[in-house]
C-alpha cells in the first residue's frame, strides 16, 4: 500500500558524504533519533519511514489507530490492547509491539509531526505536498520504487482520503464594507430572507424607512414635520424598532438615535442545503432557495450555519385592546387602546438568494456581490495548531507542518468555519463574525499514564505553556496544537465556543 500524505527521503541527498559509511551513526541517523514514534529505519544506509498508508488503522479491531489533522496517525492507548494486528498487516514491517509499565502498544507509526524534516542536515526529508507543489512528485515515486526493490514487496496505491489539494476555492456572496457602513441597518430590515443579522438594538437607527413610506414626505429619520403630517401612521407601523408612537395627535420619537453594523450575514456557502434532510433548501448556481412547506424544522441547517444566520424567528401580530376587548386598529377613534404583540408562529429564516435588495437600498453603497477566493495559507502568524481542520464540516483542510502551510482540498466550499474559529485570524473572514473559546466551559488536561514524554507538545505550543504534558492552564489559549500533535492522544481537549464581543 502507498500512502497519500507522507514524509519521504530524497535518496540522492540522504547521507551523501563518504564519511557517513564509517560514522558511529551508521546504524542510526539524526531523523531516527528525533522521531518520537520510531517510525524511521535505515536500509542500505538511507532513511525510510512509515508510509502513512492507513493499513494499520483499517485493520485495528479496537479502532485505536486514527488519522490526525496532519495526515499521520496516532495510537489511542486507552483503546489499544496490544494485539499486534497492526504490526502483522504493515506492508513494510516497521510497526513493532513494545511493552512499557505492563502495557503493550505499537510503535513505528508516523504522526507527520515534521521533526525529521527539521533535523535532517542534508534537507533530504520532505513532505509529499512539498514535492507536489514544486512539481517534483517523481522523487516520491522513485523513493517508493527503491523501497519496493529493497524489501521485495509490492506497494499498491492505497485509497486516499477524499479530496485533492487545490490552488484556490471560489465563492460568490454579498460583502459589506465595514468602513463604508454607517450602521443604519436598512439592509437588515429590508432583506426578505432575514439573511443580514442586526445587532440587538432598541433605538432609532436612522434607516429612514419611515420617510420612504410617508405619503406626504412629512418625516425623515424619525423627525416629523407636523405641518405636513396627516397621522396616517404608516411610519409607526413600518418602524422596525418601534421607535415612533402617537401622543396627543402627534407622532413622536420615543427612542434614542443609535447606529449599529450587522453582526453577520449569509455568505452563500450552501452548507445548510447540504445538511437539509427534508429537501426544503436548494443551493443552485450560488443562489439559496427555501420552501417552508416541506421544512421539518429539524434545525440541522441552524446547527451547521457557520455565521449563525440560519435561525428560528418568531412572528408576532400586534393586538389592540380596549377595556379587555380585542379591537381592530381602525376603530381607535377617541378610545384609549393598549397594544401588545402576540406570537403567531415560528419560522426558519436566513439564507441569501442574491436578490440585491440590500445593494440597491444601501445609502452608502457599502454592499456588493464579490467573489471570495480562499487560497493556501502560508503566514508567519499561523501557529499550525489544527483548529481549522478540527472545526471544518467537510474535512477539507490539511495542515502541512513540514512546510508551514494550511492547504485546502476540492471538498472545500469556502464556508469560512475555519476563519471564524482561527485563533490567529490568518484565514480570510468575509463577515468579520468571530468565535472564541469559552474558557469557563472548556478544559484541557494530560493523562500522564499515556504520555511518552516525546516533547512534541513543547515544540508546537505557541505560548510555551506546556512542559512534557504538564499544562499551565492560565496561559493556555486552547488552540489545540498540543492535542493535535500528540502521537498517543494523551491530551484531552474539550472546547466550547462563544461569539466574540
UniProtKB/Swiss-Prot annotation:
User: What organism does the record attribute this protein to?
Assistant: Methanocaldococcus jannaschii (strain ATCC 43067 / DSM 2661 / JAL-1 / JCM 10045 / NBRC 100440) (Methanococcus jannaschii)
- Keyword 4Fe-4S attached: yes
InterPro entries attached to this UniProt entry: 4Fe4S_Fe-S-bd, 4Fe4S_Fe_S_CS, Fe-S_Ferredoxin
Pfam families, alphabetized: Fer4 (PF00037), Fer4_7 (PF12838), Fer4_9 (PF13187)
User: What residues does the 4Fe-4S ferredoxin-type domain cover?
Assistant: 39-70, 71-100, 101-130, 172-201, 195-224, 220-249, 257-286, 286-315, 341-372, 373-402, 403-432, 442-471, 467-496
**Name of the featured protein:** Uncharacterized polyferredoxin-like protein MJ1303
Keywords for this protein: 4Fe-4S, Electron transport, Iron, Iron-sulfur, Metal-binding, Repeat, Transport
> Where on this chain does [4Fe-4S] cluster bind?
50, 53, 56, 60, 80, 83, 86, 90, 110, 113, 116, 120, 181, 184, 187, 191, 204, 207, 210, 214, 229, 232, 235, 239, 266, 269, 272, 276, 295, 298, 301, 305, 352, 355, 358, 362, 382, 385, 388, 392, 412, 415, 418, 422, 451, 454, 457, 461, 476, 479, 482, 486
Q: Which is an annotated GO molecular function term of this record?
A: 4 iron, 4 sulfur cluster binding
Q: Does the keyword Electron transport apply?
A: yes
Amino acid at each position: 500500500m502507498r500512502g497519500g500524505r507522507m514524509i519521504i527521503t530524497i535518496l540522492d541527498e540522504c547521507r551523501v558524504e563518504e564519511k557517513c559509511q564509517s560514522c558511529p551513526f551508521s546504524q542510526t541517523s539524526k531523523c531516527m533519533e528525533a522521531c518520537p514514534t520510531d517510525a524511521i529505519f535505515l536500509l542500505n544506509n538511507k532513511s525510510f519511514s512509515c508510509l502513512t498508508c492507513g493499513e494499520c488503522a483499517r485493520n485495528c479491531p479496537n479502532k485505536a489507530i486514527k488519522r490526525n489533522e496532519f495526515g499521520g496517525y496516532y495510537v489511542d492507548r486507552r483503546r489499544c490492547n496490544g494485539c499486534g494486528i497492526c504490526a502483522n498487516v504493515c506492508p513494510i514491517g516497521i510497526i513493532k509491539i513494545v511493552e512499557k509499565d505492563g502495557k503493550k502498544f505499537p510503535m513505528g507509526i508516523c504522526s507527520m509531526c515534521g521533526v525529521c524534516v527539521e533535523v535532517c542536515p542534508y534537507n533530504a526529508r520532505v513532505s509529499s505536498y512539498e514535492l507536489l507543489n514544486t512539481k517534483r512528485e517523481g522523487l516520491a515515486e522513485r523513493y517508493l520504487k527503491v523501497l519496493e526493490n529493497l524489501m521485495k514487496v509490492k506497494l499498491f496505491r492505497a485509497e486516499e482520503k477524499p479530496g485533492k489539494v487545490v490552488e484556490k476555492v471560489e465563492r460568490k456572496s454579498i460583502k459589506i464594507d465595514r468602513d463604508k457602513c454607517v450602521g443604519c441597518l436598512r439592509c437588515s430590515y429590508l432583506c426578505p430572507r432575514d439573511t443580514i443579522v442586526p445587532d440587538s438594538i432598541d433605538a432609532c437607527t436612522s434607516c429612514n424607512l419611515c420617510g420612504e413610506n410617508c405619503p406626504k414626505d412629512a418625516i425623515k429619520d424619525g423627525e416629523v414635520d407636523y405641518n405636513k403630517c396627516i397621522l396616517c401612521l404608516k411610519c409607526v407601523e413600518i418602524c422596525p424598532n418601534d421607535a415612533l408612537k402617537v401622543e396627543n395627535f402627534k407622532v413622536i420619537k420615543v427612542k434614542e438615535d443609535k447606529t449599529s453594523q450587522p453582526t453577520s450575514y449569509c455568505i452563500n456557502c450552501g452548507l445548510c442545503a447540504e445538511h437539509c434532510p427534508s429537501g426544503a433548501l436548494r443551493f443552485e448556481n450560488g443562489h439559496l432557495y427555501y420552501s417552508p412547506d416541506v421544512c421539518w424544522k429539524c434545525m440541522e441547517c441552524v446547527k451547521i450555519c457557520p455565521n449563525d444566520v440560519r435561525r428560528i424567528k418568531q412572528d408576532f401580530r400586534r393586538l389592540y385592546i380596549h377595556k379587555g376587548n380585542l379591537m381592530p386598529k381602525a376603530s381607535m377613534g377617541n378610545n384609549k387602546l393598549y397594544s401588545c404583540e402576540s406570537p403567531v408562529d415560528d419560522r426558519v429564516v436566513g439564507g441569501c438568494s442574491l436578490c440585491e435588495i440590500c445593494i440597491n437600498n444601501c445609502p452608502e453603497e457599502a454592499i456588493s456581490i464579490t467573489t471570495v477566493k480562499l487560497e493556501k495559507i502560508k503566514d508567519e502568524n499561523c501557529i499550525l495548531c489544527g483548529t481549522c481542520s478540527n472545526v471544518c464540516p467537510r474535512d477539507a483542510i490539511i495542515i502541512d507542518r513540514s512546510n508551514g502551510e494550511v492547504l485546502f482540498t476540492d471538498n472545500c466550499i469556502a464556508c469560512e468555519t475555519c476563519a471564524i474559529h482561527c485563533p490567529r485570524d490568518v484565514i480570510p473572514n468575509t463577515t468579520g463574525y468571530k468565535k472564541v473559546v469559552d474558557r469557563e466551559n472548556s478544559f484541557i488536561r494530560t493523562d500522564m499514564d499515556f504520555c511518552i514524554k516525546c516533547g512534541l507538545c513543547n515544540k508546537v505550543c505557541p505560548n510555551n505553556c506546556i512542559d512534557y504534558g504538564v499544562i499551565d492552564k492560565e496561559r493556555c489559549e486552547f488552540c489545540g496544537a498540543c492535542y493535535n500533535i500528540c502521537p498517543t492522544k494523551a491530551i484531552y481537549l474539550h472546547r466550547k465556543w462563544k461569539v466574540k464581543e
